[in-house]
């Protein structure tokens, strides 16, 4: 059905030139007809089988408009044929046409490359083709721009599939030379382009040609279908679609035509040249409400005019379907596909009488794009009293399995006296594996390897720069928009706490990818007994330990590096890392048990996996390199201890305290904020068992220091000035605090409104968490001394015992002051923590 639609966009020429050329051409045609040489060039740029009176109406309007232009001819102005715009300036007129009518070509020049024939009128080119190129249908037009002049160069492509079509009627004799087809659709950048100008005829001249005109128009349209199908390329997805079977009776001149009321007030003839409307009608003649709304916005015409235009076009082309047929055709068009096979187009012109006569077969094996439904039928409607025995011309699509086979599959002919348009049966294609339809790039699922690369980049920076994006494009093969969208989604999810991307989870993903690639699955904690391998040397163990300190889950590249350096197999390396992780976890559990945990495993595992993710963080996230595996375990445990100690002191840390915790623990700030949020929720439900243990631990330390506090309280109360000096001295150097200064310091804390209190309260408040756990091996205390951080959690054992006893009495009071300050700010701090 697509072949029946043509754009009637004429070429824009100057008004004076239009009149001169029309008058000359009309005189030439009158001379030819007077000499008794009827012209067969009746292929105008209107759709096939248009009613005769509709063309006359168009001619009358054309003549009237030309008469109106006589006054403008003297002025030398330019008038637009598509809108009332007119101007005296050629540049303004050209700009108007380019902006408002982009499909219009101004003053084209037609050139026939075969004969070196040149003309400015498409009708003259059609006459030239009918005289000098009879029977040629495979014309090719090439658009060329030369010095602000548009040149359409016509050439003929060599083909072996062109067969001349002859049509015979009751009034034609045996020696009729046949009707040659010389008109092809004009193309401009893939769109149909033709000149819709019609030469006005007198009624008495047009009447004798009615019979010949109807026959010629029928055969011309059939040939144009083949010509257009032959010039279209195949779809890229190699899916064959079903084209409507076009049924046109050969005795169309004897069939009464259906009158179409084009002169109604609601019918808008401007829609006949609208490419959007024509394309929509070509796709499906029954538009939905959504399509009507879209066409209303696209064409800027009322919806009622569009409805009437569609109804008129269906009436003109004999399309009348029931609602069930419309629904079925729409389902077949948009939901069903037929396997890709080389299509064979067969045209079977039937005889005019019921007698069986051998019929010529026109077969073309042209690769083409075939669109539409198998139930679409185009035919002339016959009256009830007329009983004409005819089988219409059927354009069918036959599926062929063998690529070398070109024999047409003959469609069964229709029965005589058809009451309704017949549907050509399309042979069912052989069973074949269905082609997977292509999905958009945004709908494709990403592989595990692509996600692993994205997560690794996300850990480094949540806002990647252009260089990182280009690197990800090369590594993952994803589009830039997909990568940007993935980062945006995961930033949102991390802020809401939906997903948490850590180096530990990334390592597990890479291990799973490696296991899938090698045909086996890696288990973090395998249940089976490990296989015994040969003893490893000291150098191999040192290399493995160094790699374990960086990450307990080595990446694929790290495993390959270890294989080269240690000369061990992949299984040996994986087994060693698995055993090493089990040893680390058991030692962590032993440390928790030694601290007095009442319930086994309650400290190591928290609901929702909040604590387990922090306990299993790899050493790669820690600040600095660690000297030994035991230090890594202590440092991991130290992170948990710092967080719990801070939580026991204040449940709502300030943003500055969050930053300090992130610097001390080496954890991501979002992980720390999430940890506090989850533990506050657990505290409300009463399932936070370790909090009581930490609070008891603080209370026991404070009771041991109460004796020293009571002893020095009386002495320091007598000398408040010395207490102030001691406070300032401690602020400068905490290690230089003597016994006498500590005795003067604690009572001074009780005096309100003194700068000494602010000085002492400000100094410990900077240390919102501590590194007391690191002091168990004699290293954490040195770090605390160098950084000036006060330990509020544990009493240090060893060299620092004397100092701890000296200033332990006032540490309790300072800690209480910090807790009170944190509680007072608890109303405003949650919002800040949520934003962090």
From Swiss-Prot:
Cross-link (Glycyl lysine isopeptide (Lys-Gly) (interchain with G-Cter in SUMO2)): 64, 455
One annotated GO biological process: retinal bipolar neuron differentiation
Family the entry assigns: Belongs to the ZHX family.
Pfam families, alphabetized: Homeodomain, zf_C2H2_ZHX
Ranges where the record places region Required for interaction with NFYA: 263-497
Biased composition (Basic and acidic residues): 50-61, 192-214, 699-709, 730-746, 813-824
Gene that this sequence comes from: Zhx2
DNA-binding region ranges: 263-324, 439-501, 530-591, 628-690
Name used for this protein in its record: Zinc fingers and homeoboxes protein 2
Required for repressor activity: annotated segments: 263-446
Locations listed in the record: Nucleus
Annotated stretches, region: Disordered: 1-61, 164-214, 404-442, 699-836
One MF term in the entry's GO annotations: protein homodimerization activity
Entry annotated with the keyword Transcription regulation: yes
Phosphoserine PTM sites in chain numbering: 824, 826
Record-linked Gene3D superfamilies: Classic Zinc Finger, Homeodomain-like
Region (Interaction with EFNB1): 27-77
């Amino acid at each position: 059905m697509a072949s029946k639609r043509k754009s009637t966009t004429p070429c824009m020429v100057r008004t004076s030139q239009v009149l001169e050329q029309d008058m000359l051409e009309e005189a030439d045609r009158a001379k030819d007809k007077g000499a008794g040489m009827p012209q067969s060039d009746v292929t105008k740029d209107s759709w096939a089988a248009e009613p005769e009176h509709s063309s006359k109406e168009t001619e009358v309007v054309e003549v009237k408009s030309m008469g109106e232009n006589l006054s403008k001819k003297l002025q030398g102005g330019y008038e637009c044929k598509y809108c009332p715009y007119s101007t005296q300036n050629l540049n303004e007129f050209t700009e108007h046409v380019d902006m408002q009518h982009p499909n219009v070509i101004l003053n084209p020049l037609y050139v026939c490359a075969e004969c070196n024939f040149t003309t400015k009128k498409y009708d003259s080119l059609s006459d030239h083709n009918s005289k000098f190129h009879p029977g040629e249908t495979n014309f090719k037009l090439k658009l060329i721009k030369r010095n602000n002049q548009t040149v359409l160069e016509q050439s003929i492509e060599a083909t072996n599939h062109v067969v001349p079509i002859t049509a015979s009627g009751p009034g034609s004799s045996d020696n009729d030379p046949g009707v040659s087809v010389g008109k092809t659709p004009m193309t401009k950048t893939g769109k149909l382009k033709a000149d819709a100008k019609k030469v006005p005829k007198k009624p008495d001249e047009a009447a004798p040609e009615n019979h010949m005109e109807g026959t010629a128009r029928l055969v011309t349209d059939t040939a144009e279908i083949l010509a257009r199908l032959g010039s279209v390329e195949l779809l890229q997805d190699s899916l064959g679609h079903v084209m409507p079977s076009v049924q046109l009776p050969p005795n169309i001149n004897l069939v009464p035509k259906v009158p179409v009321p084009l002169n109604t007030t609601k019918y808008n003839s401007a829609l006949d040249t609208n490419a959007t409307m024509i394309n929509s009608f070509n796709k499906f003649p029954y538009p939905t409400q959504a399509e009507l709304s879209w066409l209303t916005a696209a064409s800027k015409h009322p919806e009622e005019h569009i409805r009437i235009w569609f109804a008129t076009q269906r009436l003109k082309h004999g399309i009348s379907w029931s609602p069930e047929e419309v629904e079925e055709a729409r389902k077949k068009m948009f939901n069903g596909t037929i396997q890709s096979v080389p299509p064979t187009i067969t045209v079977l012109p039937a005889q005019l009488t019921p007698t069986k006569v051998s019929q010529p077969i026109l077969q073309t094996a042209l690769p083409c794009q075939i669109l539409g439904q198998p139930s679409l039928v185009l035919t002339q409607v016959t009256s009830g009293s007329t009983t004409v025995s005819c089988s219409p011309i059927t354009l069918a699509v036959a599926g062929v399995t063998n690529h070398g086979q070109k024999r047409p599959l003959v469609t069964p002919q229709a029965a005589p006296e058809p009451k309704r348009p017949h549907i050509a049966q399309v042979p069912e294609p052989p069973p074949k594996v269905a082609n997977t339809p292509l999905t958009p790039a945004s709908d494709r699922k990403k592989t595990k390897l692509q996600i692993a690369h994205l997560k690794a980049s996300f850990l480094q920076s949540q806002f990647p720069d252009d260089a990182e994006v280009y690197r990800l494009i090369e590594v993952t093969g994803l589009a830039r928009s997909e990568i940007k969208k993935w980062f945006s989604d995961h930033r949102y999810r991390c802020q809401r706490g939906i997903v948490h991307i850590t180096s530990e989870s990334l390592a597990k993903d890479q291990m799973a990818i490696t296991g899938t690639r090698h045909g086996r699955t890696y288990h973090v904690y395998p249940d089976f007994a490990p296989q015994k391998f040969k003893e490893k040397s000291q150098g191999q163990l040192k290399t493995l330990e160094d790699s374990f300190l960086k990450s307990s889950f080595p990446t694929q590249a790290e495993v390959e590096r270890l294989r080269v350096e240690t000369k061990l197999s992949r299984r040996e390396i994986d087994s060693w890392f698995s055993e090493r992780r089990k040893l680390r976890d058991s030692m962590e559990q032993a440390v928790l048990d030694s601290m007095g945990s009442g319930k086994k495993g309650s400290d190591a595992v928290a609901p929702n996996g909040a604590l387990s993710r922090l306990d299993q963080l790899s050493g790669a996230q820690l600040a600095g390199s660690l000297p030994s595996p035991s230090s890594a375990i202590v440092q991991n445990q130290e992170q948990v201890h710092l967080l719990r100690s801070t939580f026991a002191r204040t449940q709502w840390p300030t943003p500055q305290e969050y930053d300090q915790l992130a610097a001390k623990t080496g954890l991501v700030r979002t992980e720390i904020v999430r940890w506090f949020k989850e533990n506050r929720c657990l505290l409300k439900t009463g399932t936070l068992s370790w909090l009581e243990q930490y609070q008891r631990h603080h209370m026991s330390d404070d009771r041991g220091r109460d004796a020293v506090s009571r002893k020095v309280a009386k002495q320091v109360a007598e000398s408040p000035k010395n207490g102030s000096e001691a406070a300032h001295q401690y602020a400068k150097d905490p290690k230089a605090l003597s016994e006498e200064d500590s005795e003067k310091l604690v009572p001074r804390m009780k005096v309100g409104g003194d700068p000494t209190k602010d000085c002492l309260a400000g100094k410990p408040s900077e240390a919102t968490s501590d590194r007391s756990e690191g002091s168990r091996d004699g290293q954490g205390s040195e770090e605390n001394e160098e950084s000036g951080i006060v330990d509020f959690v544990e009493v240090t054992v060893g060299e620092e015992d004397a100092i701890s006893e000296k200033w332990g009495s006032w540490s309790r009071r300072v800690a209480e002051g910090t807790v009170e300050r944190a509680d007072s700010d608890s109303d405003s701090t949650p919002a800040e923590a949520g934003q962090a």
